[in-house]
Each structure stands twice: as structure tokens, then as C-alpha cells.
Regions:
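Sec-dependent N-terminal signal peptides of Gram-positive bacterial secreted proteins and lipoproteins
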Residues: 7-28
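N-terminal secretory signal peptides that target proteins for export/translocation
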Residues: 1-7
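A glycine-rich, hydrophobic loop/mini-helix early in the fold
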Residues: 69-84, 94-96
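Beta-propeller blade repeat segments, especially FG-GAP/WD-type strand-to-loop junctions
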Residues: 105-119, 153
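Blade-edge motifs of beta-propeller repeat domains
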Residues: 29-77, 115-126
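Acidic/hydrophobic-patterned starts of short beta strands in beta-sheet-rich repeat architectures
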Residues: 88-99, 134-137
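Acidic, small-residue rich beta-repeat scaffolds with periodic aromatic anchors
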Residues: 28-51, 138-244
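Beta-propeller blade termini
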Residues: 79-88, 126-134
């Protein structure tokens, strides 16, 4: 009797492990499917050579990609647009990064089972990957306005601003000023004015750009020839820093 009881307990335990395993596989498949829907749309848009407007409402994710391929042939565009699945915040679930050259055009994560767009990047508002779950945002709104921000992706898939510089023309002194905050907004009332020349600001831009990491991209031309791979694992330390 005792042996039967032990056998039943072991059988129940094995069944639980099996069901948990199936649940995990289903979750992974679901994440792949959600990301694949986005990649399918991008692939179709680039392959067809049609404007992003033909794919419904005006969407930043499509516009960001279209900006970089509109002057290319469909074949060139499919080679130029890249993607990678990478766990950026150490939660064990990959984010979807899309880009061209080493510039990110889109970052997606999954929130509550739905695709969540973290950001879209354009030529004049560009994003780059710094490694360890961190990102660089560099943009310009003309000769008198530039931004330079550093961010990391938290465990909930939100961007957290670590440092944000921006330039501002002060008509009172007829001079460009540099401001800094950790809010990620170009608001001088929320910022600290820095004793920094434009030349120093330019050198800071160059210094941070030199820290940009090269990603293990796969081209859209290769998309569909195999399942997308999760590349790279990140872990979060007790201090909340993401490490590889």
C-alpha cells in the first residue's frame, strides 16, 4: 500500500513537470508568433516596394523602416533591414530589435501578451544599442537643438532615463547652452545648465557613439528560412544593473 502511494506521488509529480514544460513551450511559441506578425508586415512592405501608408494607419514602426529603404529596390531593402531577438533586460524573455546598419529603427517587447513598442528610431532621432540592456538616443531638430540620452530597459519593458543632454539657444546672450536632466525631456525648467561648450558637447556625442555595440543581425531576406533565434542572455544583479 505504501509502495502504491509513493508511485502515485511520483506519477503526479512527473505529470506536473510535464504540464509545466508544455506551458513554457506554449509561452515561447506565443512570443515567437507575436514577433513574427510584426516581421511578416515589415517583410511584406519591403518586398512589395509599396509605401507604409498602404498598410493601414500611419505607424511609426513602419515609417521608421520605410525611411531607410524607400530609395532601394525590394531585394536591396530586404538585405538592408535587419532584426535580432535579444533579452535586453534580463527577464529571460527576448525583445525584438529591428534596424539598419547599426542604427535601431524599432524596439519591441511583449506586455500582457501583446506586442509593445518601446521606441521607433529615425535618422533625425536615432537609437543605438550600448550593450548590457542600455541604449543611446541621439537626435537633432536643426542647428539650434540636439539631444543625447542614455537609457536602460527595466524588467517591465519600460525605458528608464539615466542621462539626457540637450542644447538650447538663449537669445538673451545669443549663445547655445547645454542642459542636462534624468527625465528625458528637453525642458530647461527641469534641467541643470552645464558649463559646456558646443565643442565639448560634440566630443561627448562622439565618445558615446564609439560605445555603440554591433549586433548579430539577421536580414529580412533570410527571414522565413528558419525560426527566429534568441541570441544572448542578460542577467540582472542585485543592484539592478544588467550584465552579460
Amino acid at each position: 500500500m505504501k509502495g502504491k502511494k509513493g508511485w502515485k506521488q511520483r506519477a503526479c509529480l512527473c505529470l506536473m513537470v510535464f504540464l509545466i514544460g508544455l506551458s513554457g513551450l506554449a509561452g515561447a511559441s506565443s512570443r515567437d508568433d507575436i514577433y513574427r506578425e510584426e516581421l511578416d508586415i515589415l517583410y511584406t512592405m519591403v518586398q512589395s516596394g509599396n509605401s507604409y501608408i498602404l498598410f493601414g494607419e500611419e505607424r511609426d514602426d513602419l515609417l521608421a523602416v520605410w525611411e531607410g529603404v524607400r530609395d532601394l529596390s525590394p531585394e536591396q531593402g530586404l538585405e538592408a533591414v535587419k532584426y535580432q531577438l535579444l533579452d535586453c533586460n534580463g527577464d529571460g524573455k527576448p525583445e525584438l530589435l529591428i534596424g539598419q546598419d547599426n542604427r535601431l529603427t524599432n524596439l519591441f517587447t511583449i506586455r500582457d501578451g501583446q506586442l509593445h513598442q518601446v521606441f521607433s528610431g529615425f535618422y533625425r532621432n536615432a537609437w543605438y544599442y550600448l550593450g548590457n540592456g542600455r541604449f543611446l538616443n541621439q537626435g537633432s531638430g536643426g542647428a539650434s537643438f540636439s539631444i543625447l540620452g542614455e537609457y536602460h530597459l527595466d524588467g517591465n519593458g519600460n525605458l528608464v532615463c539615466e542621462s539626457y543632454y540637450f542644447t538650447h539657444w538663449d537669445p538673451a546672450v545669443e549663445k547655445m547652452e547645454v542642459y542636462w536632466n534624468t527625465f528625458g525631456v528637453p525642458d530647461i525648467t527641469l534641467s541643470e545648465k552645464k558649463d559646456m561648450t558646443m565643442d565639448q558637447f560634440g566630443k561627448l556625442q562622439e565618445k558615446l557613439r564609439n560605445k555603440v555595440k554591433k549586433l548579430s543581425w539577421k536580414s529580412l531576406a533570410r527571414y522565413g528560412k528558419g525560426r527566429v533565434d534568441v541570441e544572448g542572455k542578460a542577467r540582472v544583479t542585485a543592484a539592478g544593473k544588467v550584465k552579460r
